[in-house]
Amino acid sequence: MKGNREVINQLNQVLYHHLCAINQYFLHSRMND
């Protein structure tokens, strides 16, 4: 189970960074309108 927890933490970090990137993308596209 300890290994699984590590994998879940890694996936959470990846998801978090993807969400931040998407938010930045939308923010910039709205600012350019």
Swiss-Prot record:
Highest taxon listed in the record's lineage: Eukaryota
* Coiled-coil region(s): none
The chain positions of domain Ferritin-like diiron read 1-33
**UniProt keywords, alphabetically:** Iron, Iron storage, Metal-binding
Molecular function in Gene Ontology: ferric iron binding
Give the UniProt record's GO annotations in the biological process aspect: intracellular iron ion homeostasis; iron ion transport
According to the record, the segments passing through the membrane are none
Q: What family does the database annotate?
A: Belongs to the bacterioferritin family.
Relate the protein's function as given in its record. Answer: May perform analogous functions in iron detoxification and storage to that of animal ferritins. Contains approximately 750 iron atoms per molecule.
Assembly and binders: Oligomer consisting of two types of subunits: light chain and heavy chain.
Q: What is this protein called?
A: Bacterioferritin light chain
Organism this protein belongs to: Absidia spinosa
